[in-house]
A protein has these predicted regions:
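Histidine-acidic metal/acid-base catalytic patches
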Residues: 1-7, 11-27, 54, 96-98, ...
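Active-site-proximal loop/turn and secondary-structure-junction residues that shape catalytic pockets
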Residues: 9-11, 38-40, 66-69, 104-108, ...
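Arginine residue identity/basic-tract feature
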Residues: 25, 48, 58-59, 70, ...
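Short Pro/Gly-enriched beta-strand edge/turn motifs at strand-loop
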Residues: 30-31, 142
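Structural motif corresponding to the early beta-alpha repeats
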Residues: 32, 36-127, 228, 232-242
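Active-site acidic/histidine proton-transfer and metal-coordination neighborhood
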Residues: 75-169, 179, 251-259
Length: 271
């Protein structure tokens, strides 16, 4: 299994200078993949990133970002959001990422109550609004369910399978699975054939393995369903105001951000 790390462990938003400083260290520690968030188009140059990663033997994964104002359901910003997602696919093609991963349905933090019929209508609208995005590229859209505090639309694998068009894949993130799924390994098996990307962290969003999560069962289920993509550490720094507020990171989650990555990598290699 290829192992990766998201640049959010250290910084946000990503810039060309940040990537030039981080990527050699990530490669030196032994990661296979570096995960690149596209917060705003133009934050970093994908062609420049592609050359840098190729020189270091690193692969890329790309994550989409859904701040307030990016929505595909019950919103007047659907067209702009579709344009943004298509841009993320173009970026992914340039850097060689097979997926764009993230909650491609609603702004993170946007929650509202829905009756069963209202939820069904929201899912139908989502399917319709994702079609032109999925049709845009061979890059696979990997949609991520989030926990109940960050969205009310897609919290579980079961909901995602109901809501999403067949051609959309899933991103599974241990942080959210641990909150919303009664049995994360069973959720993996339920998602068999649809899992396009996996993000990992400790259950406190810190270092993988320094928690009580049943890692052997989870990784065993991924093997059982023949998941072939990477496991990418996604965590966040408390030292960046934007990201600390967005992800509710109010204190350091490891002795250092480097330790979070290096110790997490060492643990993941044991699985």
């Amino acid at each position: 299994v290829n192992l990766g790390v998201n640049t959010w462990v250290w910084t946000s938003p990503l810039t060309d200078g940040d990537l030039e400083a981080l990527a050699p260290r990530v490669a030196g520690w032994g990661f296979d993949v570096i995960e690149l968030p596209v917060e705003q188009p133009g934050d970093w140059d994908p062609a420049r990133a592609a050359d840098l990663l190729a020189s270091l033997g690193l692969r890329a994964s790309v994550v989409l970002v859904m701040p307030p104002g990016r929505d595909l359901v019950a919103s007047d910003t659907v067209r702009e959001t579709q344009d943004y997602l298509r841009h993320c696919m173009d970026v992914a093609e340039i850097v060689g990422s097979p997926v764009i991963a993230g909650p491609a349905y609603s702004a993170v933090g946007r929650t509202w109550r829905m009756s069963a019929s209202e939820r069904a209508a929201a899912y139908a609208e989502l399917r319709q609004n994702l079609k032109s995005v999925i049709d845009h590229s061979e890059v696979r859209l990997a949609v991520e369910p989030l926990n109940r505090y960050e969205t009310s639309l897609l919290n579980t694998v079961e909901q995602a399978l109901e809501a999403l068009p067949e051609r959309a894949g899933l991103t599974l993130d241990i942080y959210h699975l641990n909150i919303e799924e009664k049995d994360p390994a069973a959720a993996v098996r339920l998602a068999a054939g649809r899992i396009a990307h996996v993000q990992v962290c400790g259950t406190d969003r810190g270092t993988p393995g320094q928690d009580r999560f049943d890692w052997p069962a989870f990784v065993g289920a991924l093997r059982e369903v023949s998941y072939g993509g990477p496991l990418v550490i996604e965590s966040f720094t408390a030292h960046n105001q934007t990201i600390a507020t967005a992800a509710s990171i109010w204190r350091p989650l490891a002795p250092s951000q480097d330790a979070l990555a290096v110790d997490g990598l060492a643990f993941l290699r044991t699985l």
